[in-house]
Amino acid sequence: MSALEWYAHKSLGDGIFWIQERFYESGNRANIWLVRGSEQDVVIDTGLGLRSLPEYLYSSGLLQDCGSKEDAGRRPLLAVATHVHFDHSGGLYQFDQVAVHRAEAEALARGDNFETVTWLSDSEVVRAPSPGWRARQFRVQAVQPTLILQDGDVINLGDRQLTVMHMPGHSRGSICLHDKDRKVLFSGDVVYDGSLIDWLPYSRISDYVGTCERLIELVDRGLVEKVLPGHFNTFGAERLFRLASNYISKAGICHKVSTFAMRSLASLALRVTNPRTSP
């Protein structure tokens, strides 16, 4: 299967494109965002990486190919992972320039499929990307980041800037990217319009509460009007406020106890399926 078949996209205007993996039918299917700038383009999350995402970007005309991969005339392209979970980081190995938060840089560099929570089944991939492909073969490949991100860093695209916000809770290195001028928030799995996951091995409820308080502050200060999340559909500031507030309100003792049990089961399952890379 070609990259042009595997991916599909639509334009949201203002140089932003929403890309998805057509034949990965799962709640884990991540949104891939392309943000075009005057001096640099940025891909936010890369999906599973079962077909070449860079090939799709150029073959579909989303980006202009000025020649060979080494051609200095090509505008720089940076792949940013909002976190290293497999559904977001699987395609990072296809890019020359890769950025991730420092808290998860080591896990990515060693291909730690325990921390990437790799969990994929044949039933979720409704058309095999290549003959004989099986989900049990899938692993997130080790990638050495070329850019280590911290809270407050700014990624300069020329005519727009994306500010890094370290937002742990879902994972220890989760980030949002905030376009302050346009009041757009690329939220990864920090927040999306669904049940927020805080029961994975490196999730932490106390961190998530602090993150949600930051999200509420963004809304209160009028700094976000549109959220482009890691899963499902986009939404606005009012929904962002409600999602963050609801999480804080439920994060009591009962939730912590049930989450502890779920985290224990998830960790056990991941250690069985990813024995070589679990700590």
UniProtKB/Swiss-Prot annotation:
<feature type="binding site">
    <location>
        <position position="88"/>
    </location>
    <ligand>
        <name>Zn(2+) 2</name>
    </ligand>
</feature>
<comment type="similarity">
    <text>Belongs to the metallo-beta-lactamase superfamily. Glyoxalase II family.</text>
</comment>
<dbReference type="GO" id="GO:0008800">
    <property type="term" value="F:beta-lactamase activity"/>
</dbReference>
<dbReference type="InterPro" id="IPR050855">
    <property type="entry name" value="NDM-1-like"/>
</dbReference>
<keyword id="KW-0862">Zinc</keyword>
<keyword id="KW-0449">Lipoprotein</keyword>
<feature type="binding site">
    <location>
        <position position="85"/>
    </location>
    <ligand>
        <name>Zn(2+) 1</name>
    </ligand>
</feature>
<feature type="binding site">
    <location>
        <position position="83"/>
    </location>
    <ligand>
        <name>Zn(2+) 1</name>
    </ligand>
</feature>
<keyword id="KW-0256">Endoplasmic reticulum</keyword>
<dbReference type="GO" id="GO:0005789">
    <property type="term" value="C:endoplasmic reticulum membrane"/>
</dbReference>
<feature type="binding site">
    <location>
        <position position="87"/>
    </location>
    <ligand>
        <name>Zn(2+) 2</name>
    </ligand>
</feature>
<dbReference type="InterPro" id="IPR036866">
    <property type="entry name" value="RibonucZ/Hydroxyglut_hydro"/>
</dbReference>
<feature type="binding site">
    <location>
        <position position="189"/>
    </location>
    <ligand>
        <name>Zn(2+) 1</name>
    </ligand>
</feature>
<keyword id="KW-0443">Lipid metabolism</keyword>
<feature type="binding site">
    <location>
        <position position="189"/>
    </location>
    <ligand>
        <name>Zn(2+) 2</name>
    </ligand>
</feature>
<dbReference type="GO" id="GO:0052816">
    <property type="term" value="F:long-chain fatty acyl-CoA hydrolase activity"/>
</dbReference>
<keyword id="KW-0479">Metal-binding</keyword>
<feature type="binding site">
    <location>
        <position position="170"/>
    </location>
    <ligand>
        <name>Zn(2+) 1</name>
    </ligand>
</feature>
<keyword id="KW-0378">Hydrolase</keyword>
<feature type="lipid moiety-binding region" description="S-palmitoyl cysteine">
    <location>
        <position position="254"/>
    </location>
</feature>
<keyword id="KW-0472">Membrane</keyword>
<dbReference type="GO" id="GO:0006631">
    <property type="term" value="P:fatty acid metabolic process"/>
</dbReference>
<comment type="function">
    <text>Acyl-CoA thioesterases are a group of enzymes that catalyze the hydrolysis of acyl-CoAs to the free fatty acid and coenzyme A (CoASH), providing the potential to regulate intracellular levels of acyl-CoAs, free fatty acids and CoASH. Has an acyl-CoA thioesterase activity towards the long chain fatty acyl-CoA thioester palmitoyl-CoA (hexadecanoyl-CoA; C16:0-CoA). Displays a substrate preference for fatty acyl-CoAs with chain-lengths C12-C18.</text>
</comment>
<dbReference type="Pfam" id="PF00753">
    <property type="entry name" value="Lactamase_B"/>
</dbReference>
<feature type="binding site">
    <location>
        <position position="231"/>
    </location>
    <ligand>
        <name>Zn(2+) 2</name>
    </ligand>
</feature>
<protein>
    <recommendedName>
        <fullName>Acyl-coenzyme A thioesterase MBLAC2</fullName>
        <ecNumber>3.1.2.2</ecNumber>
        <ecNumber>3.5.2.6</ecNumber>
    </recommendedName>
</protein>
<dbReference type="GO" id="GO:0005886">
    <property type="term" value="C:plasma membrane"/>
</dbReference>
<feature type="modified residue" description="N-acetylserine">
    <location>
        <position position="2"/>
    </location>
</feature>
<keyword id="KW-1003">Cell membrane</keyword>
<keyword id="KW-0007">Acetylation</keyword>
<keyword id="KW-0276">Fatty acid metabolism</keyword>
<dbReference type="InterPro" id="IPR001279">
    <property type="entry name" value="Metallo-B-lactamas"/>
</dbReference>
<keyword id="KW-0564">Palmitate</keyword>
<dbReference type="GO" id="GO:0046872">
    <property type="term" value="F:metal ion binding"/>
</dbReference>
